[in-house]
Amino acid sequence: DVGKKRSMNQDSIFYTDEAVGPVQNLYIVADGMGGHKAGDVASRTAIEAATEYIRESETRNPVTLLKRSIIYANDKVYKLALSDPDDYAGMGTTFVAAIIDDGTMYVANIGDSRLYIVNSEIKQITMDHSLVEELIRNGQLDRNKGRNHPEKNIITRALGIGDGVVPDFFEVELASDDKVLLCSDGLSNMIEDDEIRDIISGTDDLNEACRKLIDRANYYGGKDNISAVVVAIDWEE
């Protein structure tokens, strides 16, 4: 969703019920940055490149797939920016991706888009690569004050802004009643975690959950583009 304050949606998402190469379940959210159309181009190019790499890959190892696809995507976005500096100089994107394989979720993250696990509680799996998060972790800022910090949108890592990229990786065992949320900061900056949990836990209709999350973020101001992917884990243990 474009939100209430932006004229263009610079977020891109990927989800599918079909296999992507050797991967049965792949989900991605990317939040682009850059002037004019550059943010949209960065997020879209990153997802297209990453999914292309995974689709054509022969390895089945989820961590290897995430690492190599992100390197490939970073190279594509960075070289595109260099090829057209007038339109694309400095463009980049956040990138959070999840592969779910046989009860285990493998997550990669760059920037401040997030992945949560939701059940009776809500747990943020990723760690924001942002100035505010660094201040909080260094004890220089209280977390509650961080939500309204004037520099909360400054990120410290992004995909496509240089010839190298440093993602974080996480591996999580999933339970059969878990739900997974991938989202851009247009959602997580506008809605408290507990309310996100209540909305997702309050319905089994995943499309309805996404609509309610986006509506609520817009209700609170819709200051940025809003993207959400909600996944239900429903296998027999």
Predicted segments — roles?
Residues 1-237:
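PP2C/PPM-type serine/threonine phosphatase catalytic domain
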